[in-house]
Amino acid sequence: MPRVMWKNFHLCFPSNLTKPSSSPSGATSDDPNRPSILLINNFNLLYDDSSAAHRRLSKPLIHDVEPSSTFTASTSTAANSSSSSASYDDSDNYGFAPDDDSPPPDLTAVLASRRFFFSSPGCSNSITDSPDLRCRDNYDTATRLLTGGTAVKHYVQSPDPYNDFRRSMQEMIDAVTNAGDLRRYEFLHELLLSYLSLNAADTHKFIIRAFADILVSLLSDGHRIS
């Protein structure tokens, strides 16, 4: 019984799969659009589709390019790039013609404007402050110097500030007396203000006391102060 079924098993499939049709003409066999005929020789070919896949992929998807044309295209591209680079190399300023007669840039206006230069800071370290600004505290404490003199601020811890101030004032008055300017009242007023502004507040009592003693001595000696 199994032998009979195996012999008649091919009758279960259509006859056109087992028996190939008449061979077509040579013109039709070369037509790539004509579907191929699958021949089944045995039972395993029903599940093995490798032959059909091979036939479907027999036509190449990517056409090969001849090496000569590729080399020609690459050569022409390289020639174009070399010519363009040579044209940029022959000229300056990225393709602009050089101007030999152009004078060098003048930076005098830039240096004169001092836009990019900053002077020494004043009251703060901020670069946005104007260099003309000054601390007003310095103006408040500064005093006009004596006529023809130069004041030097020097801090000294003295054990006897009264005598030191009196001796210093006396030396300045003697220098002015020799010059003949002692008869001016403005000089003594400037002298007192200078000592008061250049010294701390706790020494003002010694300064006023020394100045008063010198003024009394001048009046007692017969000096006329106008």
Curated annotation (Swiss-Prot):
Subcellular location: Nucleus
Keywords from the named record: Nucleus, Repressor, Transcription, Transcription regulation
Main location: nucleus
Cellular component, GO annotation: nucleus
Tissue-by-tissue expression: Expressed in roots, shoots, stems, flower buds and siliques.
GO process terms (BP): negative regulation of DNA-templated transcription
Function statement: Transcriptional repressor that regulates multiple aspects of plant growth and development through the regulation of BEL1-LIKE (BLH) and KNOX TALE (KNAT) homeodomain transcription factors.
Note: Plants over-expressing OFP12 have no visible phenotype.
Entry protein name: Transcription repressor OFP12
Organism of origin: Arabidopsis thaliana (Mouse-ear cress)
Species lineage: Eukaryota, Viridiplantae, Streptophyta, Embryophyta, Tracheophyta
Gene that this sequence comes from: OFP12
